[in-house]
Amino acid sequence: MTRAFNFSAGPATLPESVLRQAQAEMLDWHGSGASIVEMSHRGAEFMSVAAEAEADLRRLLDIPDDYAVLFLSGGATTQQALIPLNFAAPGQRADYVVSGHWGKTAVKQAGVYVDVNIAASSEANGYRELPARADWQLSRDAAYVHITANETIHGVEFRDVPDTGNVPLIADFSSSIASEPLDVRRYGVIYAGAQKNLGPVGVAVMIIRRDLLERSGQPRADIFDYRSHVARDSMLNTPPTWNWYLAGLVFKWMLAEGGVTEFAKRNAAKAALVYGAIDGSGGFYRNEVAYAARSRMNIPFFLPDAELDARFVAEAKAAGLLALKGHKVVGGIRASLYNAMPLAGAEALVAFMADFQQRHG
């Protein structure tokens, strides 16, 4: 069997070696006579899987001990709703910087519970660049400042950590976590849906500075309270064990491959290839994002018209290049180059782009 190159924005491609290991262990995990899917989350077998996954993630991202790590059901959108509940008191304001679709979604979720101040937004220019830090209008008494580190739809990425002073910085890292070294201490909270760089859909990773857990936040049930999840080691309720297990395999794979420093090099090389093909096409392919804000993970681009966009997607699929259709919000084409996408995938895409332009340009 020849695997295609899957450029999906998420659920995204996973390392083949991880999939094969999961396949081999599916019916009999480590000689136990049962699948990990069937095991109790409170049994010794899965407890060891959970502990190893957390230890490996801490090693991978160099997470200090004064930060708690959670593996929770659901994805980043769920956390967008829970963050204001946990970290902003009733009547307290929270600052949001909107650099794309998912930042705007975070504002909508938070607005149900807190007074949201949109400190800055690049919506007026179509999210083609990041809001300039000098233009941010931060509140004096904000509970926190929220950013989306990488916008998958519009293809913009924060390459530097914004300085928010004594106000905790909370960041949605769903689509760029573990893609390069990360200074965790610059953030109060980091959260990420796993389905792009960390594993399959269905589990979210939270990295929370422990002192922030002392905030009273809003009245909420235990299941919505991060303190309760920390106290129970992410097992307040039955967790998504299969997803957690697979994420753990991905962590081990990343560590064995050289860790985030190595993936930063690989991701830069892949992105340079694709952007080079776009910029060198004489306008046949267009990326409209300001150069300094270009995402390494998600590269949107457009052909001269929608008919060519559709033809590109169809012919690419026939050539073994999958999921290149752009998000419905913006259209066009989108190539997602997460950690598990090999350099050969970017090379195959660039070769196809050149061939397609020669035939249709």
UniProtKB/Swiss-Prot annotation:
Quaternary structure annotation from Swiss-Prot or TrEMBL: Homodimer.
Annotated EC: 2.6.1.52
Assigned protein family: Belongs to the class-V pyridoxal-phosphate-dependent aminotransferase family. SerC subfamily.
Reactions accelerated catalytically: O-phospho-L-serine + 2-oxoglutarate = 3-phosphooxypyruvate + L-glutamate; 4-(phosphooxy)-L-threonine + 2-oxoglutarate = (R)-3-hydroxy-2-oxo-4-phosphooxybutanoate + L-glutamate
Keywords on record: Amino-acid biosynthesis, Aminotransferase, Cytoplasm, Pyridoxal phosphate, Pyridoxine biosynthesis, Serine biosynthesis, Transferase
Record's protein name: Phosphoserine aminotransferase
Lineage: Bacteria, Pseudomonadati, Pseudomonadota, Gammaproteobacteria, Lysobacterales
Known role: Catalyzes the reversible conversion of 3-phosphohydroxypyruvate to phosphoserine and of 3-hydroxy-2-oxo-4-phosphonooxybutanoate to phosphohydroxythreonine.
Domain of life according to the entry: Bacteria
Cofactor note: Binds 1 pyridoxal phosphate per subunit.
Example of a GO cellular component annotation carried by this entry: cytoplasm
GO biological process, one term: L-serine biosynthetic process
Modified residues annotated as N6-(pyridoxal phosphate)lysine in this record: 196
Cofactor(s) needed by this chain: pyridoxal 5'-phosphate
Binding sites annotated in the UniProt record for pyridoxal 5'-phosphate: 76-77, 102, 152, 172, 195, 237-238
Organism whose genome encodes this protein: Stenotrophomonas maltophilia (strain K279a)
Binding site for L-glutamate: 42
Localisation: Cytoplasm
GO MF annotation: an example: pyridoxal phosphate binding
Pathway of action: Amino-acid biosynthesis; L-serine biosynthesis; L-serine from 3-phospho-D-glycerate: step 2/3; Cofactor biosynthesis; pyridoxine 5'-phosphate biosynthesis; pyridoxine 5'-phosphate from D-erythrose 4-phosphate: step 3/5
Entry-linked InterPro entries: Aminotrans_V_dom, Aminotrans_V_PyrdxlP_BS, Pser_aminoTfrase, PyrdxlP-dep_Trfase, PyrdxlP-dep_Trfase_major, PyrdxlP-dep_Trfase_small
